[in-house]
């Protein structure tokens, strides 16, 4: 198995183990995580090819941040999560699978945040598009963009926002 595939597998196994006691996500099997979480992120890997810094906020159990950090070891990732048990898990997972390009913060992103600037800001299933952008736009480089993962039931109008790449996940 390739190194990246081994890291993803180790991440999923650790996630399932922690999930039994920490209730990190709804999924309870490896296949559910692959079908409902990992497959959402895979189509967008190429969006990151020119980035040097990425903020993933509201990362939950580490998706998409951990997966993107595995795929792009030369990009520096900051993964921010406001729920302590989830931030602890993400930090533990990053150490467990040997991600040297990842910094995990237990923090809430707001208009007063002083992180960054970042080439790309991502989040998945966190708040509204308007709230996401309003809370973090000051953290984005001038040439950067938001990559928001929203389900089919969520409507994003990218024309309404500068620096937004909207992608519908299955």
PLM regions: where:
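Conserved SAM/SAH cofactor-binding pocket of Class I
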Residues: 42-117, 123
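Conserved beta-strand signature within the Rossmann-like core of class I S-adenosyl-L-methionine
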Residues: 144-151
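Single conserved hydrophobic/aromatic residue that forms the stacking wall/gate
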Residues: 163-170
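A short glycine-rich, Lys/Arg-flanked "PGG" loop and its adjoining helix->strand segment in the class I
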Residues: 133-142
């Amino acid at each position: 198995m390739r190194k990246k595939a081994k890291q993803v597998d180790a991440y999923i196994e650790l996630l399932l183990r922690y999930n039994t006691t920490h209730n990190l996500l709804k999924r309870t099997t490896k296949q559910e995580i692959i079908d409902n979480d990992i497959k959402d992120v895979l189509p967008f890997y190429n969006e990151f090819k020119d980035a040097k810094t990425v903020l993933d906020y509201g990362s939950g159990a580490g998706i998409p941040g951990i997966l993107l950090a595995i795929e792009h070891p030369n990009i520096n990732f900051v993964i921010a999560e406001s729920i302590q048990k989830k931030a602890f898990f993400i930090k533990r997972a990053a150490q467990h699978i040997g991600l040297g390009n990842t910094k995990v913060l237990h923090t809430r992103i707001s208009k007063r945040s002083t992180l960054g600037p970042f080439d790309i800001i991502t989040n998945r299933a966190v708040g509204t598009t308007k709230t996401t952008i309003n809370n973090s736009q000051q953290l984005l480089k001038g040439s950067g963009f938001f990559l928001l993962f929203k389900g089919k039931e969520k409507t994003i109008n990218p024309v309404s926002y500068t620096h937004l790449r909207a992608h519908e996940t299955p």
